[in-house]
Amino acid sequence: VVYSVLQSLANPLNKAIGAAYAASAAFCVLQTIVLFTFIRKNSLQRRYGLCKSAVPARQFLYYVPLLILASGNLWNGAAVNYSPAEAACRIACMLCVGFLEEVIFRGLLFSAIAKDNIKSAVIISSVTFGIGHIINLFNGSGMNLLSNLCQIVFAIAVGFLLVTIFY
Protein backbone atom coordinates (compact mmCIF):
# COMPACT_ATOMS: atom_id res chain seq x y z
CA VAL A 1 0.00 0.00 0.00
CA VAL A 2 2.83 2.40 0.92
CA TYR A 3 4.49 1.68 -2.42
CA SER A 4 1.31 2.44 -4.40
CA VAL A 5 0.48 5.58 -2.43
CA LEU A 6 3.98 7.05 -2.71
CA GLN A 7 4.22 6.31 -6.42
CA SER A 8 0.79 7.86 -7.00
CA LEU A 9 1.75 10.97 -5.03
CA ALA A 10 4.92 11.26 -7.09
CA ASN A 11 3.09 12.05 -10.37
CA PRO A 12 1.61 15.39 -9.23
CA LEU A 13 4.84 16.19 -7.38
CA ASN A 14 6.83 15.64 -10.57
CA LYS A 15 4.61 18.19 -12.31
CA ALA A 16 4.70 20.64 -9.39
CA ILE A 17 8.48 20.73 -9.23
CA GLY A 18 8.81 20.71 -13.01
CA ALA A 19 11.24 17.80 -13.12
CA ALA A 20 9.84 14.73 -14.85
CA TYR A 21 10.28 11.58 -12.77
CA ALA A 22 12.41 13.32 -10.10
CA ALA A 23 9.96 12.67 -7.23
CA SER A 24 9.17 9.22 -8.61
CA ALA A 25 12.86 8.33 -8.66
CA ALA A 26 13.42 9.70 -5.16
CA PHE A 27 10.47 7.72 -3.75
CA CYS A 28 11.55 4.55 -5.58
CA VAL A 29 15.15 4.77 -4.44
CA LEU A 30 14.11 5.50 -0.85
CA GLN A 31 11.68 2.56 -0.75
CA THR A 32 14.27 0.26 -2.32
CA ILE A 33 16.88 1.23 0.27
CA VAL A 34 14.42 0.77 3.15
CA LEU A 35 13.18 -2.62 1.90
CA PHE A 36 16.64 -3.97 1.07
CA THR A 37 18.01 -2.76 4.42
CA PHE A 38 15.14 -4.46 6.25
CA ILE A 39 15.70 -7.73 4.37
CA ARG A 40 19.43 -7.64 4.94
CA LYS A 41 19.20 -6.61 8.60
CA ASN A 42 16.85 -9.53 9.28
CA SER A 43 18.89 -12.01 7.18
CA LEU A 44 15.96 -12.70 4.83
CA GLN A 45 17.92 -12.65 1.54
CA ARG A 46 17.64 -16.39 0.94
CA ARG A 47 13.93 -16.44 1.82
CA TYR A 48 13.14 -13.78 -0.77
CA GLY A 49 15.53 -14.95 -3.48
CA LEU A 50 18.14 -12.22 -3.04
CA CYS A 51 21.13 -14.54 -2.90
CA LYS A 52 23.29 -16.61 -5.21
CA SER A 53 21.28 -19.36 -6.84
CA ALA A 54 22.04 -23.01 -6.13
CA VAL A 55 21.05 -23.74 -9.74
CA PRO A 56 24.02 -24.09 -12.12
CA ALA A 57 24.49 -21.03 -14.34
CA ARG A 58 24.09 -23.19 -17.45
CA GLN A 59 20.42 -23.79 -16.63
CA PHE A 60 19.75 -20.06 -16.80
CA LEU A 61 20.21 -20.30 -20.58
CA TYR A 62 16.59 -21.46 -20.68
CA TYR A 63 15.63 -17.89 -19.77
CA VAL A 64 17.23 -16.36 -22.88
CA PRO A 65 13.87 -16.43 -24.74
CA LEU A 66 12.41 -14.33 -21.91
CA LEU A 67 15.13 -11.73 -22.44
CA ILE A 68 14.29 -11.66 -26.13
CA LEU A 69 10.60 -11.16 -25.30
CA ALA A 70 11.41 -8.45 -22.76
CA SER A 71 13.39 -6.55 -25.38
CA GLY A 72 10.37 -6.35 -27.71
CA ASN A 73 9.93 -2.60 -27.25
CA LEU A 74 13.42 -2.04 -28.62
CA TRP A 75 13.08 -4.05 -31.82
CA ASN A 76 12.18 -1.02 -33.94
CA GLY A 77 14.90 1.10 -32.40
CA ALA A 78 15.02 3.50 -29.52
CA ALA A 79 15.17 7.26 -29.36
CA VAL A 80 16.06 9.04 -26.16
CA ASN A 81 14.31 12.39 -26.03
CA TYR A 82 15.15 13.17 -22.42
CA SER A 83 17.75 15.28 -20.70
CA PRO A 84 20.48 13.28 -18.95
CA ALA A 85 18.87 14.06 -15.57
CA GLU A 86 15.43 12.89 -16.71
CA ALA A 87 16.93 9.77 -18.31
CA ALA A 88 18.74 8.99 -15.04
CA CYS A 89 15.50 9.44 -13.07
CA ARG A 90 13.59 7.18 -15.46
CA ILE A 91 16.28 4.48 -15.31
CA ALA A 92 16.35 4.68 -11.50
CA CYS A 93 12.56 4.26 -11.46
CA MET A 94 12.64 1.26 -13.78
CA LEU A 95 15.33 -0.52 -11.79
CA CYS A 96 13.80 0.22 -8.40
CA VAL A 97 10.22 -0.55 -9.47
CA GLY A 98 11.39 -3.93 -10.77
CA PHE A 99 13.12 -4.72 -7.49
CA LEU A 100 10.24 -3.47 -5.34
CA GLU A 101 7.51 -5.28 -7.26
CA GLU A 102 9.46 -8.55 -7.35
CA VAL A 103 10.12 -8.48 -3.62
CA ILE A 104 6.57 -7.39 -2.76
CA PHE A 105 4.64 -9.75 -5.05
CA ARG A 106 6.96 -12.73 -5.45
CA GLY A 107 8.93 -12.47 -2.22
CA LEU A 108 6.57 -11.22 0.48
CA LEU A 109 3.08 -12.02 -0.85
CA PHE A 110 3.79 -15.32 -2.59
CA SER A 111 6.00 -16.63 0.21
CA ALA A 112 3.41 -15.80 2.87
CA ILE A 113 0.54 -17.51 1.03
CA ALA A 114 2.62 -20.45 -0.25
CA LYS A 115 2.95 -21.74 3.32
CA ASP A 116 -0.71 -22.73 3.15
CA ASN A 117 -1.42 -23.39 -0.53
CA ILE A 118 0.94 -23.09 -3.51
CA LYS A 119 -1.83 -22.95 -6.11
CA SER A 120 -3.59 -20.10 -4.31
CA ALA A 121 -0.27 -18.33 -3.81
CA VAL A 122 0.50 -18.43 -7.54
CA ILE A 123 -2.96 -17.18 -8.51
CA ILE A 124 -3.23 -14.48 -5.84
CA SER A 125 0.30 -13.20 -6.45
CA SER A 126 -0.24 -13.03 -10.23
CA VAL A 127 -3.69 -11.44 -10.10
CA THR A 128 -2.83 -8.86 -7.45
CA PHE A 129 0.28 -7.93 -9.42
CA GLY A 130 -1.90 -7.33 -12.48
CA ILE A 131 -4.78 -5.64 -10.68
CA GLY A 132 -2.31 -3.36 -8.93
CA HIS A 133 -1.70 -1.69 -12.27
CA ILE A 134 -5.27 -0.34 -12.29
CA ILE A 135 -3.90 2.51 -10.21
CA ASN A 136 -2.54 3.97 -13.46
CA LEU A 137 -6.10 5.02 -14.30
CA PHE A 138 -6.26 7.27 -11.25
CA ASN A 139 -2.74 8.45 -10.46
CA GLY A 140 -2.38 11.13 -13.10
CA SER A 141 -0.25 9.07 -15.46
CA GLY A 142 -2.68 9.82 -18.29
CA MET A 143 -3.27 6.19 -19.27
CA ASN A 144 -6.60 5.55 -21.03
CA LEU A 145 -8.96 2.72 -20.08
CA LEU A 146 -8.17 0.33 -22.95
CA SER A 147 -4.41 0.71 -22.56
CA ASN A 148 -4.74 0.16 -18.83
CA LEU A 149 -6.88 -2.96 -19.27
CA CYS A 150 -4.29 -4.37 -21.68
CA GLN A 151 -1.56 -3.54 -19.18
CA ILE A 152 -3.48 -5.34 -16.42
CA VAL A 153 -3.96 -8.51 -18.51
CA PHE A 154 -0.30 -8.46 -19.56
CA ALA A 155 0.81 -7.87 -15.95
CA ILE A 156 -1.25 -10.85 -14.74
CA ALA A 157 0.43 -13.04 -17.37
CA VAL A 158 3.89 -11.70 -16.54
CA GLY A 159 3.14 -12.09 -12.83
CA PHE A 160 2.24 -15.73 -13.41
CA LEU A 161 5.43 -16.30 -15.40
CA LEU A 162 7.63 -14.63 -12.80
CA VAL A 163 6.07 -16.43 -9.85
CA THR A 164 6.57 -19.80 -11.55
CA ILE A 165 10.23 -18.91 -12.11
CA PHE A 166 10.54 -17.77 -8.49
CA TYR A 167 8.95 -20.98 -7.19
Roles of regions detected by a PLM:
Residues 36-45, 71-77, 165-166:
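Structural signal for the C-terminal ends of transmembrane alpha-helices
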Residues 59-64, 88, 119-124, 149-153:
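Hydrophobic alpha-helical transmembrane segments
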Residues 74-85, 138-146:
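Membrane-interface helix caps and helix-loop-helix hairpins in membrane proteins
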Residues 148-167:
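Functionally important transmembrane alpha-helices
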Residues 100-126, 140-141, 164-167:
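Membrane-interface helix/loop boundary segments of multi-pass membrane proteins
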Residues 27-38, 65-68, 97-104, 159-160:
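Hydrophobic cores of alpha-helical transmembrane segments in multi-pass inner/ER membrane proteins
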Residues 1-39, 58-59, 63-64, 84, ...:
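Alpha-helical transmembrane segments in multi-pass membrane proteins
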Residues 2-8, 67-76, 126-136:
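Aromatic-anchored segments of alpha-helical transmembrane domains
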